[in-house]
């Protein structure tokens, strides 16, 4: 029996020894070179310098020169081996790092306590999500990529150690310290995420430090304030708390931090923190589990780090088996105590030297044998790269979790039928969540703060009763569920979005039961808010899974998946576009601004259903008083033909109301007795009908007896003092016929041309009469004509019995959520959002803002087949994505795929034109409206005011350029002479050219 027991003991010993292998970082290094450097340093060190290697002091560079002097004194007096920075900016920390490294004879370890990256401690750095969000992500390769990016940023900062990942299994909803610092409640899930992160971090040669051993997840106390206890038995600890650390050790990672926890199942000595426990640090962690990497204490200044009155904290930590003492409260006293303990034999000198050698080995691994100063020039830009921005966004996108979705309520559908409000609890109106919601539809903003009075709460909920759908964002744990919210959820369609730890949603149980949809965003960061809003509208798909259970409501692993149905907002790298090359757009636009080709503009680029570039430049006017924003609404001019009239024509074609060979006179009876009677619709769309390019309808309203001579002149004179266009001067002394024009609205004068400018309703007949009698050119030849689309407008209006603007509003724009895409925007949009066009000195004699610039459209009351449409860039993109999606957007079918293909792919046999769309002139690139790199499949349109859009089905690409180049005068043609729009388009193609791309 004794022999059998001895055999078992030897087997166990063998297994234990086998488990004690080198870490990955140690295995990867050239050991001969490492040992040579370590020996050369160690042999020259005094005892004080050797002891100092085991001390890591906390530093806050933001506190100024006194703190720097204190740190320098520690380096001089106790020879500290490492610095843990707590706060500051990248520039500040880098400068202090360089000073301290220069002051230390032995290179210093620089550490970061950055569980969610540099931004946890350093301002102005990329804000990555917290671990709970990462725990909701299924794709572990993203977590590894994230770890690698944090490692890269650490290297830029001269950081060698990151106290991450947290491998705590968060199984206690009342845990006050871990919460969203944990990856979840399932030990295997936590292990997968933590190990993926560590692989990424150490791939950049940054030492990963898992914490808080033996597991801080199931505590109700915070070790910063007291000593928490965990009373589970060993079997439970092995299967839950210890499991991630076992896998981490088997994975060969370099560091572990021991926490201040009392765990009787591992050490029965009453109230002994794990940090000071030989059974835990030495017997369990090193001997039984075989960990041979660096062992760090949790911060020794924490109140959970308790020892007996006659004991020294740092001595106890070293006696327990730790290697590096992190942030002792009294470093100088502790240094002296450690030195005294060595001299008195309480600490074995050989054992201390072994740990010092281990520290030096890892300093070599971290590159400290070849120490270089941190390069401070361009540091912030090197940290905050486009890739980092993309990755932060991607992690948030993948983590948002949909917990409830009654009858597939989200992504939202039927937008044109819903009046939507957004309520923020615990955050301000117009926060990132609400602003992103407003990009998808018109949304009214409400908010209630933590200290809202009863009267305010009552008022807000009373107003919310008038809405059909309320999207409620919960941004704080300090506002509890109210009876008002419960009642609202019971009567109205309510979507709940939690920007808190999942556990706090249990306080909203009744509202959740009533809500149509519930989602978890885990934190209130700007990116979490932006992507939560996108999920609601289908800008992204729901992919996340709940990493913890919400008692009585949802189990861990819950997550409803949805499809992407609308345009989303993403970083360029999401589609592989080169952000550096996209910056060429900025340079081209800035050139146009400097040349005063236009006062401001908007540029939008979308690919694969994702808006990847969406920028505002300049101002509304050259006075530079109002900046262009994403909310700015522009006069689209002739873009109205393709984004407005053509939509109505395509819908009518879908409904088989006409064929392309149909004669227009079949639908406009007034033309049957004219030479236009045989014009077919195909020729109108191709601009080969023979119709005159334009007609100055306003001349019919001019009182010809009010002036003598000509209205126009090719040169400036006393009678023609005003420049109207390039090479055209006009007089300003004429008057309008009072029977046709009024400066006030009154019976018969309801058609508004401009401010204080109305024409008689009979003027519509005048317009049709002018079209009817206009001179017709040869058919079958290309001649661009605005009149073609006015005729198409009349056709669809006669077919439906509705005005064009109503056809488009109810049939398309409202349903698309394109609320700014509209005619006569002053009826629904604040004037301050509308970008002005021309200071018209001739026809309307006023500065135009919110009134259509085109005279033909103006004299039809702002609604015309050739012009009149206004929009911001985001809403116009929805219309264009509808074309790309073969008639589908937001999960709804607007047009048949067959009709979309016919109109977007057809091309005239005699010109570059498509059916209503313009196209590249492939044979004569100098005459092309597109950039030289645009493929033949591209379709779109330009507008006189300085607008354009181009849709590329081959590359699933949308390009929108909106400006007001006619401000203050249409005579400014520099937009065209500088080729701004086409050069921007070519810059886009260079940025998306896969041959120029780097791997993600």
Model-derived regions, located:
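Short, conserved catalytic-motif segment at the N-terminal edge
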Residues: 575-636, 657-659, 768-776, 847, ...
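Short, surface-exposed loop or secondary-structure junction motifs
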Residues: 677-936
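Second-shell residues forming the walls of enzyme active-site clefts
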Residues: 46, 83, 95-108, 118-120, ...
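Bacterial Sec-dependent N-terminal signal peptides
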Residues: 1-23
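Preference for extracellular/luminal or secreted protein segments
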Residues: 20-57, 61-74, 287, 308-574, ...
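Short active-site loop at a secondary-structure junction
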Residues: 584, 595-602, 624-687, 775-788, ...
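Short, gly/Ser/Thr-rich active-site loops of penicillin-recognizing serine hydrolases
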Residues: 352-357, 361-369, 444-452, 549, ...
């Amino acid at each position: 029996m004794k022999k059998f027991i001895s055999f078992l003991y030897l087997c166990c010993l063998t297994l234990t020894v086998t488990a004690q292998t080198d870490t990955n970082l140690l295995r990867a290094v050239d050991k001969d070179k490492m040992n040579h450097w370590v020996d050369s340093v160690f042999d020259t060190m005094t005892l004080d310098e050797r002891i100092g290697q085991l001390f890591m002091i906390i530093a806050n560079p933001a506190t100024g020169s006194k703190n720097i002097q204190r740190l320098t004194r520690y380096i001089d007096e106790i020879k500290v081996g490492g610095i843990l920075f707590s706060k500051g900016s990248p520039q500040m920390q880098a400068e202090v790092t360089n000073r301290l490294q220069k002051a230390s004879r032995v290179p210093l370890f620089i550490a970061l306590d950055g569980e969610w990256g540099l931004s946890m401690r350093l301002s102005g750095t990329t804000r990555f999500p917290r671990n709970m969000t990462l725990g909701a992500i299924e794709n572990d390769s993203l977590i590894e990529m994230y770890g690698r990016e944090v490692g890269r940023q650490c290297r830029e900062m001269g950081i060698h150690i990151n106290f991450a990942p947290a491998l705590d299994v968060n199984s206690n909803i009342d845990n006050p310290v871990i919460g969203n610092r944990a990856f979840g409640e399932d030990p295997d899930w936590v292990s997968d995420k933590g190990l993926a992160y560590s692989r990424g971090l150490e791939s950049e040669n940054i030492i990963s430090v898992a914490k808080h051993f033996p597991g801080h997840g199931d505590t109700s106390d915070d070790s910063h304030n007291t000593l928490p206890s965990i009373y589970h038995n060993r079997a439970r600890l092995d299967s839950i708390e210890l499991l991630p650390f076992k896998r981490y050790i088997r994975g060969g990672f370099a560091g572990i931090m021991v926490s201040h926890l009392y765990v009787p199942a591992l050490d029965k000595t009453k109230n002994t923190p794990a940090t000071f426990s030989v059974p835990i640090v030495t017997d369990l962690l090193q001997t039984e589990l075989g960990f041979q990497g660096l062992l760090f204490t949790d911060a020794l200044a924490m109140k959970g780090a308790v020892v007996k009155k006659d004991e020294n904290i740092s001595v106890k930590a070293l006696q327990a088996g730790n290697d590096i003492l992190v942030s002792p409260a009294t470093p100088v006293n502790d240094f002296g105590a450690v030195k005294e303990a060595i001299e008195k034999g309480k600490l074995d000198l050989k054992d201390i030297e072994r740990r010092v050698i281990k520290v030096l080995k890892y300093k070599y691994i971290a590159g400290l044998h070849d120490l270089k100063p941190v390069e401070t020039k361009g540091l912030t830009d090197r940290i905050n790269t486009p890739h980092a921005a993309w990755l932060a966004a991607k992690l948030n996108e993948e983590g948002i979790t949909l917990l409830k979705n009654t009858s597939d309520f989200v992504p939202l559908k039927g937008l044109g039928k819903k009046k939507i409000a957004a309520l923020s609890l615990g955050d301000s109106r117009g926060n990132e969540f609400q602003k992103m919601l407003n990009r998808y539809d018109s949304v009214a903003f409400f908010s209630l703060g933590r200290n809202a009075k009863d009267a305010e709460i009552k008022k807000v909920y009373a107003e919310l009763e008038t809405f059909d759908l309320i999207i409620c964002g919960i941004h704080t744990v300090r506002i509890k569920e109210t009876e008002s919210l419960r009642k609202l959820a019971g009567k109205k369609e309510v979507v709940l979005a939690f920007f808190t730890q999942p556990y706090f949603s249990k306080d909203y149980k009744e509202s959740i039961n009533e809500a149509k949809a519930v989602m978890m965003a885990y934190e209130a960061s700007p990116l979490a808010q932006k992507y939560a809003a996108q999920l609601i509208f289908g800008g992204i798909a729901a992919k996340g899974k709940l990493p913890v259970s919400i008692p009585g409501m949802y189990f861990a692993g819950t997550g409803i998946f949805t499809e992407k149905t609308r345009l989303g907002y993403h970083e360029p790298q999401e589609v592989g576009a080169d952000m550096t090359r996209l910056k060429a757009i900025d340079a081209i636009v800035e050139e146009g601004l400097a040349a005063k080709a236009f006062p401001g503009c908007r540029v939008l680029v979308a690919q694969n259903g994702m808006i990847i570039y969406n920028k505002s430049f300049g101002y509304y006017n050259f006075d530079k008083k109002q900046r262009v924003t994403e909310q700015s609404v522009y006069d689209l001019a002739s873009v109205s033909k393709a984004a407005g009239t053509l939509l109505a024509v395509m819908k009518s074609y879908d409904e088989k109301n006409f064929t392309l060979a149909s004669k227009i006179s079949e639908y406009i009876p007034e033309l049957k007795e004219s030479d236009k009677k045989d014009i077919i619709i195909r020729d109108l769309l191709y601009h080969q009908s023979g119709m005159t390019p334009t007609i100055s309808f306003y001349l019919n309203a001019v009182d010809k007896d009010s002036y003598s001579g000509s209205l126009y002149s090719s040169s400036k004179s006393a009678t023609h003092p005003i420049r109207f266009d390039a090479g055209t001067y006009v007089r300003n002394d004429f008057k309008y016929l009072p029977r046709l024009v009024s400066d006030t609205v009154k019976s018969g004068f309801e058609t508004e041309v401009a401010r204080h400018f109305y024409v008689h309703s009979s003027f519509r007949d005048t317009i049709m009469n002018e079209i009817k009698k206009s001179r017709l050119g040869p058919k079958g030849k290309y001649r661009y004509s605005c009149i073609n689309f006015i005729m198409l407008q009349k056709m669809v209006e006669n077919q439906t019995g509705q005005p064009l603007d109503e056809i488009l509003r109810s049939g398309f724009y409202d349903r698309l959520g394109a609320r700014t895409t509209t005619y006569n925007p002053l009826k629904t949009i604040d004037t301050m959002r509308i970008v002005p066009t021309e200071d018209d000195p001739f026809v309307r004699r006023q500065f135009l803002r919110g009134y259509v610039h085109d005279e033909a459209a103006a004299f039809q009351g702002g609604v015309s087949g050739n012009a009149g449409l206004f929009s911001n860039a985001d809403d116009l993109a929805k219309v264009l994505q509808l074309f790309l999606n073969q008639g589908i957007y937001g999960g709804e079918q607007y047009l048949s795929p067959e009709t979309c293909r016919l109109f977007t792919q057809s091309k005239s046999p005699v010109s570059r034109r498509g059916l209503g769309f313009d196209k590249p002139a492939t044979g004569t690139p100098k005459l092309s409206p597109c950039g030289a790199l645009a493929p033949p499949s591209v379709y779109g349109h330009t507008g006189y005011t300085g607008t354009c859009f181009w849709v590329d089905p081959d590359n699933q690409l949308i390009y929108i350029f909106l400006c007001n180049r006619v401000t203050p005068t249409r005579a400014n043609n520099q937009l065209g002479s500088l080729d701004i729009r086409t050069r921007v388009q070519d810059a886009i193609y260079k940025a998306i050219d896969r041959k120029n791309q780097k791997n993600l």
